[in-house]
Amino acid sequence: MGADAFLLKPFDENMLLARISNILENRRRFQQKFSIDMNTDSLEVDENSGDKKFLNKAMSVVKENYKNPDFEVSDFIEAVGISKSLLNKKMQSLTGQSAGQFIRNYRLNLARELLLKNKVTRTMNISEIAYEVGFNDPKYFTRCFTKHFNVTPSSLLED
């Protein structure tokens, strides 16, 4: 994990509160920025930080496995090499999402890209896109997509 800040003793209570506030604000911005594009390159974090390395590892595992509809959190845990509770704590802390939400949101973001490309090319239907990104039930895909983006896949294609 690592330290985000340190204070020398004796410390001023106001200084402690200011540091905590800054850390929480930075974490919130980090989560918000990551949740928008799910890209670690856009994050303003030291390249050698443990958080950036962890997110890069998590992203590479999901990128390698997202098409597999059987890829679940248990597989994610095994590939990342940490316990379920630690994985969920780190994912929640860094991205504001559980490991399962992270996988699903990655798939949904890819599906959105495919739908937008498909709007022009018209080479795939919604079910094919759902299968392409690792969903094995197009109806479940549509429910998740609609909940995540507040628009149905079909209406995204029509606009």
Q: Each PLM stretch: what is its role?
A:
Residues 93-136, 158-159:
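Terminal helix-turn-helix DNA-binding modules in bacterial transcription factors
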Residues 7-9:
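A Lys-centered signature of the CheY-like receiver
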Residues 21-37:
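The C-terminal output helix
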Residues 39-56, 60, 64-70:
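Regulatory hinge/linker segments at domain boundaries
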Residues 59-71, 91, 95, 113-124, ...:
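Basic, amphipathic alpha-helical hairpins
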Residues 73-103, 130-152:
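Basic/polar phosphate-binding segments, predominantly the helix-turn-helix DNA-binding elements
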Residues 11-20:
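C-terminal output helix
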